[in-house]
Structures are given as structure tokens and as C-alpha cells.
């Protein structure tokens, strides 16, 4: 009879629970700060829902009521220059990160009103969610696309799971550029089952990237319970099979989340990343708007009431009372101050017509229709002063005969010598003395550490490339066959093409995507396609297709200088 041998994963997976001693040892000032931030989120979201009912929110209102501790506890450990992103439900994460960036180190909410910077953060986020021009993205992003680079908010994404590879890319850039920092991708139980999530986690583990994959497991993807979506509902269980740590915590307990986040940062500092945190929490309301899930019949009022009995704000109040840190008078004072900040923001964003008490948006706050195309492409100012020459500008004795593939290798190697931010990513780029087409031959000889092999995960590593570009690298990503662009189509179309436009412009997206087109090679229809039309469908891309070595050198040099994403379509018949 065959012998059965139990196998164990190479990485741990565990749950962190807080104790009474943990609460006693926590700093009183920290607990009060975290409590006030949870209260701010609650009042902020209530105001957004009021405005949504009044027809004043231009777009959805994905409220985070019930999930306040999951956000505040996570942000309590992060620094301003640590990077975060999120999904469609990110008001609570973004608001906390913004407030932390503006809160003085000695601020005491029981003694002081909000500073001007704190007020401005509340106001500008509310404006953005309402689609108004004083928002962080000029109203372009709205509720689901929020960004403020100065506060470490790299951008939220409405494509479920689309943001997760980006965070791995931020971390990759930090690692290559020798910057200290943590990147965090926030997402829910729904995105945890996306293929892009698995791909990003695997790449992050492969390169030990300093990134935390933070899952707010609120049990529901719109109306679908996690039990209806996966047999293994414990999301952090996925980590050990990829070789990194998974931590589970009580997402309704502010201190439990803080400790899990602190533990994750310690692991990254001492052992390398990534880490997954699964914060088990609950969204009190429906997917969007102010109704409950039970109003739509996909869960019961009894279930909702059971979770509300563990309200994170009420739990914190009970602990603060038990510890003698605060009582009803202090809670009232905190509530008054955060409510005043929210109310002040709302008053700046609305008005009433003469003789009416119906709120409306002042005309001056609507974005200008003339700005609708801003950010689709850059203005090309990065080419100011650049010299462009055609082959006719050279004498015959100034030119050298060269194969197309050799020119490709040479131009990349020379560019990498001049620019330390250029990296190469793709499948097999580190083998065959230059990858499958010889493109990386010189790069491997000169800068082998900047040529990064990727698994067969085009959508995942294309998303990583986008994150890396947003954090200061100029990545060159290779798609081995043009047909594989359709595997990466989400990141090509919804990610790279739209990222600058949906956040209101103002930053570069320096990506070069090399695409090999290989007809007439006998590989059949799935390896012979030309995807140029795919890029043409999405105007955030520039597309070039050189046919000789001279044009390749010039166009690749331009692509590597461009602040727009450039697709370089290479027909192997010219190699």
C-alpha cells in the first residue's frame, strides 16, 4: 500500500486576536486618535449618502459604514509616503490617509478643532466624490477613482481586482530605486478570487516585494456571499501555497487591525514581502446607496443586526470607557468636531436658490466641458529640444548596415546606460542570450539585475508594469506574441490607457510595450495576430511599427523618452 506523507506549506498562516492586556498597553492618545478617525468616516459617509439621496452625487456612493476599523487600523501604521490603492469602495481608506497626512503630530482632538489642512482634506475628498472641480482629481475620478500623490494615494480602481498588480508595481519600483516604503493594495473578498490577484501575489512573492495585500472580507460581492463563490472561504489561506505569510484579524476591532498591520510591516522589514492581511468585517449597507442588503433579500435583518452588535465604533467606546481614557463627554466633543468638519465641507459645496431650501451644486464647481479630454495623452513637452533626424540627413559613410534585431538590442542597452530607471519585464527575457528575439542581449550583459523574468501571467505583469511606471520607473514590457495582448487586455485598456485621464491628468505614464507579431511561421491563428487595432481602440496609447533598423532605433528612443505609453509593434519578418 502506498505511504501517505503529510506535506506542509513553506509559509505560515495564522490569526491575531487582541487581549485585555493589549488594550491596557496601547497608548491612550493613539486610541483616541483612531476612535476620532472612525467617527469622522461614519459622519462623512452619512453626509455623502444624504447628498446622494438629494441627487447631488454625480455617480455611485459606495459607503464603507461598518468597515471603519479596517481602514483606520491599517493606516495607523503607514507613513505618508507609503503607497496605497483601492477599489470602488475606498472612501474610508482614502479619507484616513488624507487626514493622517495633514494631522500634526501633537494634535489633540479634545483640545483643538481641525487644522486648515485637515478641513481641506475633508472638503476636497467630498468634492471629488461629488464629481466637482475642487476635488483631488478635478471631479474626473468621482467616488471610484481617487488619487492624491502627495498623500501616498496612488489611485483607486473600479475594475474589480485591477488595482492589485499595481501595488506590486509600486513596491517593485521602491525596491529597484532603493527606497524604503510599504505599498498596500486594499480590496474585498470579491477581488480576492480574480486571476489578476493570484498573478500579482505570485510575482510579489517571487521578488519578495514590500507589499501588503489587504483584504476587507465583508462577505459579499454585491449580493453574492463568499460561500457561493469559493469552497475555501478563508482568503488568507491562499498565501502559504505561494510561499508567504497570511494573517487573519478581526476587522471590527481597531486594535486587532493595528496589530496585524504592524506585524505585516515587521515581516516585510525582517524577511521580505509580501504579506496578506484578511480583516474580517461587514458592510452595513447595500453595494451602493443607503438601503440595507436585507432590503434586496440577499441577507437577513437578523444577520445585519448580529454584525451591528459588534459595531467597531461602539466596541472602541466600550474599551475606552473601561480603560478610563474617555467617557460620554469626550465622545460628544469628538463627535461635534468631526461633524463640524463634515458639515463645513458640505456647506462649501452646496447652495440654495433664493426663496428655496432645496440644495443644489453651485455652477462654478462643475468641471468645464472643455477639460473632458485632458489627460488622454500628454502634451509632448518632454521632447522639447530633442533632435529628430531622418536617414536622408546622413551621408552613406555615416551609416552602418545592421540587422533589425541587433539594432533593437543595441538601442535598449544604450538607453539603459543613460537612464537607470529603465527596466525590462517579460517572459523568457532572461534566457536565450537575449530573450526569444535577442532584444535583451546587451541589457543582460550590462544590467542583468534590471531584466526581470516573469511567469506566464500577462495580465498580472502588465499591471505590475503600470504600478512601477507610476512610481518612477520606465519599464519596457515584452508581450511574446501579439495574440497574448488579449490576455493582458484589461490592464492595456482599463489600466494603462485610462489611468491618467481618469485621475484628471498631471503625471507621466512612461511605459513601452514591445509586441511581436509572427505571421507565416506555422504557429497557427493564436500566435499570428496583429493587435494594433486593440491599442487603437483606446486613445491613451501611442502606437508605432518600425519596418527597418534605422526607424526602430529612432522610434524606440522616442518611446523611451515619451511620458505616454507606447506600443511598439514588431513584425518578426523584419528581424
What is the predicted role of each segment?
Residues 1-70, 76, 285-287, 291-447:
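Conserved acidic/glycine
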Residues 46-49, 54-207, 225-231, 236-243, ...:
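Cofactor-binding active-site loop characterized by glycine-rich and histidine/acidic residues
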Residues 58-67, 88-89, 146-164, 188, ...:
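Active-site nucleophile and cofactor-binding loops and adjacent substrate-binding regions
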Residues 64, 72-79, 96-105, 435-447, ...:
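Glycine-rich loop at the start of a catalytic domain that most often binds anionic cofactors/ligands
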Residues 75, 95-100, 158, 195-199, ...:
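Short acidic, glycine/serine/threonine-rich loops at helix termini
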Residues 84-87, 137-139, 168, 185, ...:
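General beta-strand structural signal in soluble alpha/beta enzymes
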Residues 109-114, 118-134, 205-215, 451-453, ...:
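A glycine-rich helix N-cap at a beta->alpha junction
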Residues 152-343, 351, 536-575:
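Glycine-rich ThDP/TPP pyrophosphate-binding loop and its adjacent helix/strand module
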Amino acid at each position: 500500500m502506498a505511504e501517505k506523507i503529510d506535506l506542509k506549506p513553506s509559509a505560515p498562516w495564522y490569526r491575531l486576536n487582541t487581549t485585555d492586556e493589549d488594550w491596557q498597553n496601547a497608548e491612550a492618545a493613539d486610541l483616541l486618535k483612531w476612535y476620532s478617525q472612525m467617527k469622522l468616516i461614519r459622519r462623512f459617509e452619512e453626509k455623502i449618502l444624504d447628498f446622494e439621496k438629494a441627487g447631488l452625487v454625480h455617480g455611485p456612493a459606495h459607503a464603507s459604514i461598518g468597515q471603519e476599523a479596517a481602514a483606520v487600523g491599517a493606516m495607523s501604521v503607514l507613513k505618508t509616503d507609503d503607497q496605497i490603492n483601492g477599489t470602488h469602495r475606498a472612501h474610508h481608506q482614502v479619507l484616513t490617509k488624507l487626514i493622517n497626512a495633514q494631522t500634526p503630530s501633537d494634535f489633540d482632538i479634545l483640545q483643538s478643532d481641525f487644522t486648515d489642512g485637515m478641513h481641506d482634506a475633508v472638503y476636497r475628498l467630498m468634492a471629488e466624490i461629488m464629481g466637482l472641480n475642487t476635488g483631488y482629481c478635478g471631479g474626473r475620478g468621482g467616488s471610484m477613482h481617487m488619487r492624491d500623490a502627495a498623500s501616498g494615494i496612488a489611485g483607486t480602481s473600479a475594475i474589480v481586482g485591477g488595482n492589485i498588480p499595481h501595488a506590486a508595481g509600486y513596491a517593485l519600483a521602491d525596491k529597484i530605486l532603493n527606497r524604503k516604503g510599504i505599498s498596500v493594495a486594499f480590496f474585498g473578498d470579491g477581488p480576492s478570487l480574480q486571476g489578476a490577484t493570484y498573478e500579482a501575489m505570485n510575482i510579489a512573492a517571487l521578488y519578495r516585494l514590500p507589499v501588503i495585500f489587504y483584504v476587507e472580507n465583508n462577505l459579499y460581492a454585491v449580493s453574492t456571499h463568499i460561500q457561493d463563490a469559493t469552497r475555501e472561504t478563508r482568503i488568507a489561506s491562499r498565501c502559504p501555497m505561494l510561499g508567504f505569510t497570511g494573517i487573519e484579524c478581526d476587522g471590527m476591532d481597531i486594535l486587532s487591525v493595528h496589530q496585524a498591520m504592524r506585524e505585516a510591516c515587521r515581516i516585510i522589514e525582517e524577511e521580505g514581502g509580501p504579506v496578506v492581511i484578511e480583516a474580517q468585517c461587514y458592510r452595513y449597507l447595500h453595494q451602493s446607496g443607503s438601503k440595507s442588503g436585507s432590503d434586496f433579500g440577499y441577507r437577513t435583518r437578523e444577520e445585519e443586526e448580529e454584525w451591528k452588535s459588534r459595531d467597531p465604533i461602539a466596541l472602541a467606546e466600550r474599551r475606552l470607557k473601561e480603560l478610563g481614557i474617555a467617557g460620554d463627554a469626550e465622545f460628544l466633543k469628538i463627535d461635534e468636531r468631526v461633524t463640524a468638519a463634515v458639515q463645513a465641507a458640505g456647506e462649501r459645496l452646496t447652495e440654495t436658490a433664493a426663496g428655496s431650501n432645496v440644495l443644489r451644486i453651485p455652477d462654478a464647481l462643475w468641471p468645464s466641458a472643455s477639460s473632458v479630454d485632458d489627460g488622454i495623452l500628454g502634451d509632448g513637452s518632454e521632447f522639447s529640444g530633442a533632435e529628430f533626424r531622418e536617414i536622408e540627413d546622413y551621408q552613406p559613410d555615416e551609416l552602418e548596415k545592421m540587422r533589425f534585431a541587433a539594432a533593437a538590442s543595441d538601442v535598449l542597452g544604450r538607453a539603459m546606460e543613460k537612464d537607470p530607471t529603465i527596466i525590462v519585464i517579460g517572459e523568457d527575457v532572461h534566457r536565450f542570450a537575449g530573450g526569444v528575439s535577442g532584444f535583451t542581449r546587451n541589457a543582460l550583459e550590462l544590467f542583468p539585475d534590471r531584466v526581470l523574468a516573469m511567469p506566464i501571467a500577462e495580465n498580472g505583469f502588465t499591471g505590475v508594469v503600470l504600478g512601477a511606471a507610476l512610481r518612477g520607473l520606465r519599464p519596457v514590457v515584452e508581450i511574446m506574441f501579439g495574440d497574448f495582448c488579449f490576455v493582458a487586455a484589461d490592464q492595456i485598456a482599463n489600466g494603462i490607457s485610462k489611468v491618467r485621464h481618469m485621475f484628471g491628468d498631471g503625471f507621466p505614464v512612461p511605459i513601452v510595450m514591445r509586441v511581436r507579431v509572427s505571421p507565416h511561421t506555422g504557429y497557427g491563428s493564436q500566435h499570428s495576430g496583429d493587435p494594433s487595432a486593440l491599442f487603437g481602440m483606446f486613445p491613451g496609447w501611442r502606437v508605432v511599427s518600425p519596418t527597418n533598423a534605422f526607424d526602430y532605433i529612432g522610434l524606440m528612443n522616442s518611446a523611451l523618452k515619451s511620458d505616454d505609453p507606447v506600443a511598439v509593434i514588431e513584425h518578426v519578418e523584419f528581424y
